[in-house]
Amino acid sequence: MALIVQKFGGTSVGTVERIEQVAEKVKKFREAGDDVVVVVSAMSGETNRLIGLANQIMEQPVPRELDVMVSTGEQVTIALLSMALIKRGVPAVSYTGNQVRILTDSAHTKARILHIDDTHIRADLKAGRVVVVAGFQGVDGNGNITTLGRGGSDTTGVALAAALKADECQIYTDVDGVYTTDPRVVPQARRLDKITFEEMLEMASLGSKVLQIRAVEFAGKYNVPLRVLHSFQEGPGTLITIDDEEESMEQPIISGIAFNRDEAKLTIRGVPDTPGVAFKILGPISAANVEVDMIVQNVAHDNTTDFTFTVHRNDYLNALEILKQTAANIGAREAIGDTNIAKVSIVGVGMRSHAGVASRMFEALAKESINIQMISTSEIKVSVVIEEKYLELAVRALHTAFELDAPARQGE
């Protein structure tokens, strides 16, 4: 008998019919002897509908009141799923984040989980009940309802699995696992049977939408085995777990190709090359809560420097205005921007033990006449910025160059 936490997203519980299907799936696990805790999101589109109502009252709704409002979406879903289970003869009980005491900080709309009181859940499991918990929400120390931000239901599922020391946390989605890259771009992309927390964290941070990045961080911190599965198709999915050094010797060098279209590039030219120049440029950007990704600094012959960095495209206009003001303040020549870029990355723990991986990447892009504008590396990742129109060509070229189209071979 295993203790399993299952999380179903908004699409998986988007209609009453789908909720009935989820109940059938949960019932099978109970019949197999497993203890099950289910975490569900609001029905697809419901959170946006509720936010729309709030926006009709206030253009910028008060965060505390918005949390009270949007948390009702999950309350509907947990009750419906519990009813569907009880109808099938499966004892079930539903809990909101407040009822199950998912304690968070007080950062409304983006709260972080601090502690979970598992007393009620363990008592219900011992009594043979399936426990259905509302994802995405909790309560702060003053009893205020909080929400965890977009994708927070994944985090709820992982946090519950960690608190309960579950054998596995299963994340059900509209895909049957984690792929080597987006199959819509590369039809030959393969589903991965297994991937490490490190690799998944890199892929999530680089734009992979399969798992929410905070959930992966939480799972890695508390060593919660994650499995990504399709909600309505049978299959083994993808297991996300710790790196097994002996096993990884037989894994391919690269596990996946990630990409992100949501990047923008900013450059400030002719900056006097003096100590502290990076802080003078990035300090005001940071003060505006704009997150900087990749950075490149070039020193010219006339004791000036060109400083380039990337930000999320949503922050582009704000960051460009700040950079223009900074250019005037520090005597730089100009500040310019470019939104026609994209980031492509190769990810794999195999890079640690193999030399020449970056060179192989650059060669593959050069063969397609794709110019690299910026480069960033980590222990298990190499990222490049290229012109956006070449993005899909680059992904396909790299997928082929690292033999991800074909079955992985030992000793690759």
From Swiss-Prot:
Belongs to the aspartokinase family. It holds the Pfam family ACT. It is an enzyme of class 2 (transferase). GO terms for molecular function: aspartate kinase activity; ATP binding. Residues 266-340, 346-412 form the ACT domain. It catalyses: L-aspartate + ATP = 4-phospho-L-aspartate + ADP. The lineage of its organism: Bacteria, Pseudomonadati, Pseudomonadota, Gammaproteobacteria, Pseudomonadales. GO terms for biological process: diaminopimelate biosynthetic process; homoserine biosynthetic process; lysine biosynthetic process via diaminopimelate; threonine biosynthetic process. Its EC number is 2.7.2.4. Pathway: Amino-acid biosynthesis; L-lysine biosynthesis via DAP pathway; (S)-tetrahydrodipicolinate from L-aspartate: step 1/4; Amino-acid biosynthesis; L-methionine biosynthesis via de novo pathway; L-homoserine from L-aspartate: step 1/3; Amino-acid biosynthesis; L-threonine biosynthesis; L-threonine from L-aspartate: step 1/5. It comes from the Bacteria. This is Aspartokinase. GO terms for cellular component: cytosol. CDD domains: AAK_AKii-LysC-BS (cd04261), ACT_AK-LysC-DapG-like_2 (cd04923), ACT_AKii-LysC-BS-like_1 (cd04913). The keyword Amino-acid biosynthesis applies. PROSITE patterns: ACT, ASPARTOKINASE. Keywords: Amino-acid biosynthesis, ATP-binding, Diaminopimelate biosynthesis, Kinase, Lysine biosynthesis, Nucleotide-binding, Repeat, Transferase.
